[in-house]
């Protein structure tokens, strides 16, 4: 492309708009450490790569980040979203008892700070637990243009 690296492209030009993205998929290598380093060595700046990698720090390959702590790291996540990166976060922690207690603070914060992808262990109702995640497609509260309409993106 016209940018020296992926990070510069997403933070200056941005991602393709929804109309030009419909029917397409994004692939992301979730593995980190040596696996990510090996992939980056084969595809410097992700040039000709089939998939993005999950970023942990700002590098030339950065495009998609994962931070599962929307409460404690809210400012960091929101700053990444504002910069143009895609951010994945979590709505709940199955091991932490949040769902058992119908605690929604983590979920609500992930939505509020603009996480694009919000993972859950409760995509449908579970017997004996009130909590479950039912998110509709919506305009991002941080990165969507002012004229964005939820109806237009469904």
Predicted segment positions?
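Catalytic cores of phosphodiester-bond hydrolases, prominently lipid phosphodiesterases
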Residues: 1-154
